[in-house]
C-alpha cells in the first residue's frame, strides 16, 4: 500500500503532527477506498477523535496518540488474520501484523513462478580503486529461518503464539 502524505490547506494551522479532522477524513476517503465498507465510518470516528484532541488542548502528545490509534485501527482492518468481532490489544495487533508479513514473505519465497526465474544480473563493477569491495551480506531470510524460536522464551508463552 502506498504511503499517503496529505497537504495542509493554507488556512488555520493545526498542531504539529496532527492532520486536522476534515483533512484526515478527505485523505482517507481519497486513498482508503480499499479498506472495505466501514472505511467511511472509521474515518469519521478518526476525524472526530482528532477534533476532540485539538479542542481539548494543542498538545502534540494528544495528536500523536490520536495518530497512533488511527494507525492501529488501519492495521486491524488491513490484516486478514485479526478476528473482526473480537477485542484485541495493540500487542496482539502487532503480533498478527508480524505473522502476516512472515506469511507473505514465505509465500513469495516459495512461489513457483519466482523459483523458475533466473537470478537478476549482477550490478556493474566499479572501476579499480574507486570503491572498496564489501563482502556479500547474508539475506535476512537466512537469518530469520525460525522466528518463533528467537522470540519465544520461557516467560513469554502468554504474549507469543
Curated annotation (Swiss-Prot):
GO BP, sorted A to Z: astrocyte differentiation; brain development; cell population proliferation; central nervous system myelination; central nervous system neuron differentiation; cerebral cortex neuron differentiation; circadian rhythm; fat cell differentiation
PROSITE patterns, alphabetized: BHLH
Swiss-Prot/TrEMBL induction comment: Expressed in a circadian manner in the suprachiasmatic nucleus (SCN) of the brain with peak levels between CT16 and CT20.
Pfam families in UniProt: HLH
Keywords recorded for this protein, A-Z: Nucleus, Repressor, Transcription, Transcription regulation
Leader peptide range in chain numbering: none
Domain bHLH residues, every copy: 52-104
Domain of life: Eukaryota
GO molecular function list: protein dimerization activity; RNA polymerase II-specific DNA-binding transcription factor binding; transcription regulator inhibitor activity
Major subcellular location class: nucleus
Tagged with keyword Transport: no
GO CC annotation: cytoplasm; nucleoplasm; nucleus
SUPFAM superfamilies for the chain: HLH, helix-loop-helix DNA-binding domain
Cellular compartments annotated: Nucleus
CDD domains, alphabetized: bHLH_dnHLH_ID4 (cd19694)
Phenotypic effect of disruption: Mice do not exhibit a noticeable circadian phenotype.
Function: Transcriptional regulator (lacking a basic DNA binding domain) which negatively regulates the basic helix-loop-helix (bHLH) transcription factors by forming heterodimers and inhibiting their DNA binding and transcriptional activity. Implicated in regulating a variety of cellular processes, including cellular growth, senescence, differentiation, apoptosis, angiogenesis, and neoplastic transformation.
Subunit-structure text: Heterodimer with other HLH proteins.
Entry protein name: DNA-binding protein inhibitor ID-4
Biological classification of the source: Eukaryota, Metazoa, Chordata, Craniata, Vertebrata
Gene name of this polypeptide: Id4
Amino acid at each position: 500500500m502506498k504511503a499517503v502524505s496529505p497537504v495542509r490547506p493554507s488556512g488555520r494551522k493545526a498542531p504539529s503532527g496532527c492532520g486536522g479532522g476534515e483533512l484526515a477524513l478527505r485523505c482517507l476517503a481519497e486513498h482508503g477506498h480499499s479498506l472495505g465498507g466501514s472505511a467511511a465510518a472509521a474515518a469519521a470516528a478518526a476525524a472526530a477523535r482528532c477534533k476532540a484532541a485539538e479542542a481539548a488542548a494543542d498538545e502534540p502528545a494528544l495528536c500523536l496518540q490520536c495518530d497512533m490509534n488511527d494507525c492501529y485501527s488501519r492495521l486491524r482492518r488491513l490484516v486478514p488474520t485479526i478476528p473482526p468481532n473480537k477485542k484485541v490489544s495493540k500487542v496482539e495487533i502487532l503480533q498478527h501484523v508480524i505473522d502476516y508479513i512472515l506469511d507473505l514473505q514465505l509465500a513469495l519465497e516459495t512461489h513457483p513462478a519466482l523459483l523458475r526465474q533466473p537470478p537478476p544480473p549482477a550490478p556493474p563493477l566499479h572501476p579499480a580503486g574507486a570503491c572498496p569491495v564489501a563482502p556479500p551480506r547474508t539475506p535476512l531470510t537466512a537469518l530469520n529461518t525460525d522466528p518463533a524460536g528467537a522470540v519465544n522464551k520461557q516467560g513469554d508463552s502468554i504474549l507469543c503464539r
